[in-house]
Amino acid sequence: MGWEVVLLTIEPAEHSTMFHHPNVLWCREQAREMGLEFVSVKAKGKEEKDELLAMKQALLKMKADGVAAGAIESEYQKERIDRIAHELGLRSFAPIWRASETLLEEQVRYFETYVVAVAAEGLSEGMLTRKFDGQFVKYLKALKPAVSPHLEGGEGETFVANAPFFRKKLKIREWKRKFDGSSGAAEIAGLA
């Protein structure tokens, strides 16, 4: 028996430590290209507890049997998702948890991914909208101190515009960048 997969997106207040923020409104398009049902829920407050409550309520409303997350290195995120799943009696999956470098190499090779937020020393405004490719991974590893190539410690965020399981590529027509001198984000202003 398989699983019916639904893409659940929690729309947090800006600067969430738990959930992705830049370009979250475009997750609907990603779900469409993956052929998945899409559910989006706005967190009613700015604190972590508000975001987790939104997730918990959405999972209950959906009558979910499990929750899968893309956490790779963030104990912070994985522990909280596991806790919500446990409280609701759901199975928790993190299929790429502690994934090898091979998985990152495959993502770089087969996915079209863009850097949409930066917040670490060595990551400048010029990195925004840059393709997340092999050269970028090498750059991150060479920084002193090194930055995780998964960008999971709050160092940055990415947006996937194409993947082997997308029906067609999301063609980004325009970006709007904001940078305050030490961190910034690039929001998609439109798709072609």
What residues fall within each predicted segment?
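ATP-dependent adenylation/nucleotidyltransferase module used to activate substrates
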Residues: 1-117
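ATP/NTP-dependent adenylation/nucleotidyl-transfer catalytic domains that generate, transfer
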Residues: 30-39, 63-68, 80-89, 109-192
